[in-house]
Amino acid sequence: EKNIDLNKYTSFIDLFNEGFSKFPDDIAYENMGKSITFKDLDQLSKKFSNFLTHELKLKKGDRLAIQSPNVLQYPVALIGALRSGIVVVNTNPLYTPDEMRHQFKDSGCKAILILSNFAHNLEKIISETEIQYVIVSNMGDMLGSLKGSLVNFVVKYIKKMVPSFSLPGYYSFKNVLSLGAKYEYSQVEVSPNDIAFLQYTGGTTGVSKGAMLSHRNVVSNVIQVSSWMD
């Protein structure tokens, strides 16, 4: 038998903060040949958090939808949102407009980060939701100036994977980080029982339902898996 301390961390952010301090120069994530360290992730997610808190004036408990595949922008946005005490609503990038409408209305999300490839679907239903703020990211936004520009050009103009869309007043992901850099970061107080995620089911027995996952839920699962792997 092995005893584990499920109260070791107050929140999911505490867990990440430990990683940021212990392994600053280690690679945290890698995508399409580009990697970011834990130090990079720490700094970038603070900028994203600052933007949500100071520019959008989002409050603890507000919902942010993230509709993105596995690109480097995703962990930056996810951790940044959690640092602001915001509830993350992960959204399947392959959702139809009808499925998006249901999830966004049901969750009550006020803001969304969406990859430009799917923004045309958001345009169709955004007026029926509570979404006030839209952040649009391009596939190559975190790949560096040269490679990122090339990837974005190929995706949009060669492969034609970004249908035209109109979302007046949206923020670009790069602009979000620039605006967030203006502020000094301050961690929002998050308790173990605060909701971290609204994770929606597959909807195999009806409409998709949002499962409330607290910081304690997620941290406990991480500790359990880590203990089992040891």
Q: Where do the protein language model's features map onto the residues?
A:
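Flexible, non-catalytic linker and terminal segments flanking ANL/adenylate-forming cores
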Residues: 1-9
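Conserved AMP-binding/adenylate-forming
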Residues: 8, 31-36, 49-98, 116
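AMP-dependent adenylate-forming
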Residues: 14-37, 186
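Adenylate-forming
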Residues: 19, 29, 41, 45-48, ...
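Conserved AMP-binding A3 loop
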Residues: 37-39, 196-223
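Conserved structural elements of the adenylate-forming
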Residues: 42-48, 178-183, 211-230
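Structural core segment of the AMP-binding/adenylate-forming
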Residues: 83-175
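Conserved pre-ATP/AMP-binding loop-to-beta segment of ANL
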Residues: 164-200, 207, 230
